[in-house]
Curated annotation (Swiss-Prot):
InterPro entries, alphabetized: Metallo-B-lactamas, RibonucZ/Hydroxyglut_hydro, RNase_Z/BN
Positions annotated to bind Zn(2+) 2: D67, H68, D212, H270
Family: Belongs to the RNase Z family.
Name of the molecule in the record: Ribonuclease Z
Cross-referenced Pfam families: Lactamase_B
Entry annotation: catalytic residues: D67
Role this protein plays: Zinc phosphodiesterase, which displays some tRNA 3'-processing endonuclease activity. Probably involved in tRNA maturation, by removing a 3'-trailer from precursor tRNA.
Keyword Zinc part of the UniProt annotation: yes
Record organism: Lactobacillus gasseri (strain ATCC 33323 / DSM 20243 / BCRC 14619 / CIP 102991 / JCM 1131 / KCTC 3163 / NCIMB 11718 / NCTC 13722 / AM63)
Catalytic activity: Endonucleolytic cleavage of RNA, removing extra 3' nucleotides from tRNA precursor, generating 3' termini of tRNAs. A 3'-hydroxy group is left at the tRNA terminus and a 5'-phosphoryl group is left at the trailer molecule
Gene Ontology terms for molecular function: 3'-tRNA processing endoribonuclease activity; zinc ion binding
Amino acid sequence: MEIQFLGTSAGQPSKSRNVSCTALKLLDELNEVWLFDVGEATQHQILKTNIRPRKVTRIFISHTHGDHIFGLPGFLSSRSFQGDGGPLTIYGPAGIEQFVQTSLKVSRTRVSYPIKYVVLKEDGLIFENNLFAVYTARLDHRVPSFGFRVVEKPRPGELLMDKVAEYNVPNGPLLGQLKAGKTITLSDGQKLDGRDFLGKERPGRVVTIIYDTRPTENIGKLADHADVLVHESTFNGDEEKMAHRYFHSTCLDAARIARDRHVRKLYLTHISARYTGKAGKELEHEARKIFKHTRLANDLDSFEITLRG
């Protein structure tokens, strides 16, 4: 599992930052990539990475402001042009389907794959398979805005090889089935329950994505004990009143959530163009006074999300 920042600017691009997009790479787990918001020129940013558009199977849109969605039509078109793209699901507030369909219709663009739309209305579960679950909750912005919590389901414990050796389980399919927690039958007819040969179950990883919002209780619920919290940091701490007036957050707001909700790592994104160079690093330094495991995200930064313990 890996997270990569394709755009980290707020409102409009700057010379060093594109507008919002974060990629969650689940290649080892699902052979998929999920995108969170698709700002203008996201497809150009992708060209600078190893992400293949056909691997993108799910797109989560926080809200319908232009700096978070203007890259969608172009990306969808290019994904079709490159071929081999399977079905795609877009999760977002009301209006996202109309925006996409109107853009494609006016530009006479035809995509070669089905697109499913899931309209975000209420807090709760919006996706689940055998490995992951995704939850959403309403944030506090000028338009309907949602945060996301991606939860990896618990992983089976390690295979207890010393115990396996006692029963002379041969290498091959039987050992693999045992590792998967299944019951196997040995050549002498003896049955072994795989669950008895596994160590303690390991907790899965949790990734929380919070874009445009001012502080609200739901952020804490989504961020609780997350391994990674990606949080908007449009302004520094001195601009708190202005930030909240415009329905945004400061680097200190993000740091307090990370500290109070026992997050492992905080990444600051959605940075105002006023914070360039040293001013940008000051956001990081300021936040670290509250939560030391803070990092200012830059475009194309990529980080592995490791398992706990």
